[in-house]
Amino acid sequence: MEASNQDEIIGTDVIPNEQDNPEEVVPEPTSLDVPPPPPERAPSAPKRVEILDCNSLNGLMYHYFAQGDYIECKSIIGEIQSKYLERNEAAFHVRGLIARNEGELEEAMECFHKAYELSGKNKRYFYETGRCNFLLGRHQIAVEQLTKASEVMKDNPKVWYWLARAIYHFPAEKVQGKTFNPVESARTILMKPDIAKDATLICFLGRLCEELGDTSGAIAAYKSSLKLQPDNTEVMNLLGLIYLRTGQVQEGFVQLGNCLAYDPANSQAILTIGSIMQNHSDHDVALNKYRVAADVSDYNGCLWNNIGIGLLARNKPAASHSALKKAAFINPLNYKISYNLGVLHDIMNLHCSALHYIKLCTELYPQNAKAVGAMAVILSHMNDDKNARLAYKKSIELKKNPSTILNYAIFEYRMKDVTAASNALKLYKDLQASGVKCSANNKETANLLESVLKQPDQSAEQ
């Protein structure tokens, strides 16, 4: 009998020992068990943080804006805003400036408002929005915003300049029993000594003084402006004109001559000098001056008006008519051009056309006594004596012009109303005695009429 193997297990069913599958054994935790440490991970590379500078393209944007290349500038602005999610303050600011220069004022205000929000509500942007509101005609809102801007921009003369311009457009009204004068208020703002550093501001101050009748203040302002900008031909013109208005002809010619020295083709200076020459009956020299101005500034109604007067003085009515018609086409609302056309048509015996232009002149400027007097002359040429007499009386009522009064005296003499003619002639003599300037031709005509009016009295005495 063979010995049995003790390692052999006899039987069909095998009962596994718990130690055969150790993974399935869950030991009961004890207080002495310590959790195993976590597995060590390989160190990862540090993350790279990219710092975005939203102002990196500002230099290129300002470069295109300064050059006036708005297309490229707007392209750069679009790139900046799309890349930095519209968080660039300078881009909105420059875009607003471009929109304002292009006349898109509402878009400009929207851009300035966004820049204002991004800047932490910087009050300096009230200056930009105030200018937009001024251009839109919202003067009250413009004054409020520019006043806020002046609190942080006290040394910027442009803020005060635009504030004065906005106040200048206010209506004159009574406030608490006092009359509010916008021109006086605007001048008061610009009279501050610490802001008188800008030529444009001082030039506007001179215009305000001139409007208020302060001639000496206007001259002083224009001189100060010339010290800041010695080559400013516009200020030279204004100073020359105010010298001429005050009777300082020599000083006026000096300023106009300086203007032509800087700009020989300056149409405004040439027009002023030419008109003075025409007043002294030097029409040929004036026309030569106008020829230079016409080459540079052909589309100038006042220039062609003066050319027409010069040609009429040289007895060229057809050429004068062409020049005056061109002047009327360029500037149809200038009453002086309509007046000259009326006088020209009356000289050419075209009385209906003359009456049409003189009537247009009186509609443009109803209180023009000279035009009403010219209408009376034309009506008398048309044998409308009743309306001519009414026009003469209306003209004398508006202003006692020596030429109109003398024409009325001659008209009444022709109508055989000696009494009315004598009264009109007496009124003319009184004006002449009071120092009113009368031409030598008018004086000679008045003396002749006086001698004629005395003849019926002498024959009645005999």
Curated annotation (Swiss-Prot):
Keyword Acetylation found: no
Subcellular localization(s) per the UniProt record: Cytoplasm, Cytoskeleton, Microtubule organizing center, Centrosome; Cytoplasm, Cytoskeleton; Cell projection, Cilium membrane
User: Changing A388E: reported impact?
Assistant: Abolishes interaction with bbs-5. Unable to target to cilia
What does the UniProt entry list as the effect of changing E107Q?
Answer: No obvious phenotype
**Does Protein transport count among this protein's keywords?**
yes
Which parts are the TPR repeats?
89-122, 124-156, 199-232, 234-266, 268-300, 335-368, 369-402
Q: Which GO-annotated molecular functions does the record name?
A: protein-macromolecule adaptor activity
* Effect of loss of the gene: Single mutants do not display any obvious defects in ciliogenesis. Double bbs-4 and bbs-5 mutants display a defect in cilia structure and function. This is characterized by an increased accumulation and mislocalization of intraflagellar transport proteins and impaired movement of intraflagellar transport proteins along the ciliary axoneme. Double mutants also have defective polycystin-mediated cilia signaling and mislocalized and increased accumulation of mechanosensory receptors pkd-2, osm-9 and odr-10 within cilia.
Q: Which PROSITE patterns match?
A: TPR, TPR_REGION
Q: Which UniProt keywords apply?
A: Cell membrane, Cell projection, Cilium, Cilium biogenesis/degradation, Cytoplasm, Cytoskeleton, Membrane, Protein transport, Repeat, TPR repeat, Transport
SMART domains cross-referenced by the UniProt entry: TPR
Which residues does the annotated region (Disordered) include? 1-46
Listed under GO cellular component are:
BBSome; ciliary basal body; ciliary membrane; cilium; cytoplasm; pericentriolar material
Q: Which GO terms describe its biological process?
A: centrosome cycle; cilium assembly; protein localization to cilium; protein transport
Matching InterPro entries: TPR-like_helical_dom_sf (IPR011990), TPR_rpt (IPR019734)
Q: What does this protein do?
A: Component of the BBSome complex. The BBSome complex is thought to function as a coat complex required for sorting of specific membrane proteins to the primary cilia. The BBSome complex is required for ciliogenesis but is dispensable for centriolar satellite function. Required for proper BBSome complex assembly and its ciliary localization. May be required for microtubule anchoring at the centrosome but not for microtubule nucleation. May be required for the dynein-mediated transport of pericentriolar proteins to the centrosome.
Annotated family: Belongs to the BBS4 family.
Give the record's subunit note.
Part of BBSome complex, that contains at least bbs-1, bbs-2, bbs-4, bbs-5, osm-12, bbs-8/ttc-8 and bbs-9. Interacts (via C-terminus) with bbs-5; the interaction is direct.
The record ties this protein, via PANTHER family, to: BARDET-BIEDL SYNDROME 4 PROTEIN, PTHR44186
Under what name is this protein listed? BBSome complex member bbs-4
* Organism for this UniProt entry: Caenorhabditis elegans
